[in-house]
Amino acid sequence: MLSLLAASLAADPIYWTDLGLRPGIDLGFFTLRYYSLAYLIGVIFAYWHTSKMLKQPGAPMAQRHADDLFFYCTLGVILGGRLGYAAFYTGGATGIPSAFTDFSGDGFVSWRLLRLWDGGMSFHGGLLGVTAAMFYVAWRDKLNFIRVVDYVCVGVPMGMLLGRLANFVNGELWGRASDMPWAMVFPGADDLARHPSQLYQAGLEGLALLVILLLLFWKTRARYRPGLLAGVFTLGMGISRFVNEFFRQPDAQLADFAARTGLSMGQWLTLPLILTGLIVVLFALRKPPLASGTTAPA
């Protein structure tokens, strides 16, 4: 039955296995996973680009603040992403314990939660973790929180771009069944040709949003309007993820939830992002811009 449906959807689909992709680089003593490498390169790029932006007039913080900030942000994205996935996306069904329901016999969360190499990271959890890290550093060093977010968020889409490309290389998080010419058959996807939704996400929330934010920072005076860059990032990320969820196959353990509510878990979690981003952008545009000579604590 499934094979007949696959044949009707795509007469000559692309087979992911024919691409010769591997999940990592074999270094002999261990395999460097592309997903881990994507996180590493994303953090390095964001740090490098933020340091470059801080050399421009009107920066909200000094380099020493950025050094501390990216240490805490790295912890925030890893811990927040993992805890967010366990809390919102598992229900204990994938080997990653739910932070709310799957406790060990002695009352503590299972150590399986720490097995990052098994996969499972939530964008929304990572976003909350990074936001908490930025808030802590801004509060501790008496920095303008929203302007710190403005600068940090510009480089974030690079990490999203690389992360989604890594998902594609791993053959995971594929999309819904499709008859488009570029539809692909992924391992474990019931031999159905599907949308390569990882590439859609890489293009929308990665490349497109990165270009928009870079142009706003380097070619306009957006950085002198506190909250504008942060709002555009939040709004753009929310819209990109909401749209892409229509092409992405819902998580198996949440398929019933999506069927009952009409939207996926990712879309429900994204709606507050869209609303928040829109409000922040409107407020940023209503206020007069800062003077070019505005400086931050050294």
What are these regions, as identified by a protein language model?
Residues 2-298:
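Hydrophobic, membrane-interfacing alpha helices
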